[in-house]
Amino acid sequence: LNLDQQIFSWAKVGFTSNLVYRDLNSGVKNTFTKSLSAIPLGDAYTEEGEINHEYITGQYSPMSDFIENQYVDNTRSTYLNVSGYVELTPVKDLTFTSRVNGTLNHSRRGQYWGEKCNANRPSYAGSPHASITNNNAWNYTWENILAYNTTIAKDHNLGGSLITSWNKNQSESSMAASSGQMVDQWSFWRLTSGTSQHVESDFAQTQKMSFAFRLNYSYK
């Protein structure tokens, strides 16, 4: 959504927004490398046409991650970016501009590793293992510019600007996980069904205020 409007001869406003929603299912990254070391014997599929997890005694298929309900990595995210400005010219040669930009980002990542899964899991994880990670972040920047530009005696250009900028960022995350689920179909939705739990959380914040002053002069 975009808007630019001249509301008075001395005032102009604008607004821009962008919203993105994503639902992403990610695959594993080590299937090909595991297939290079797999013994090229045995039956890759069962008589029912399903992937044969143990295709030779003691040898497990590099395709086991693709067995139904054995590996899940789903991320849902929402991103919002909004910016606006107001530009004022109260007197000739003097301009005041104020801009605000902000972003809001949320994501939920759900992962599940079944007993037959080959994909790397966290070092603390048992088998099966499931986790849900939530990330929230937001930031905004507010800038103000007071500018004066004039021409004296047709040949002398004189200008000056006073600039301020305020920025703040904040992010937080939480992760809950458990191991030992008995039903693969539960995926990452029933963490309380595991026999051992693991929890992590984090928070970070930064903020900054900046000032600048500039003078310009040019002849002809």
Question: Can you say where each PLM-predicted feature lies in the sequence?
Answer:
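Active-site and adjacent substrate-binding regions of carbohydrate-active enzymes
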Residues: D93
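Surface-exposed loop/interface segments of Gram-negative outer-membrane beta-barrel transport/assembly proteins
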Residues: N2-N81, T97-S210
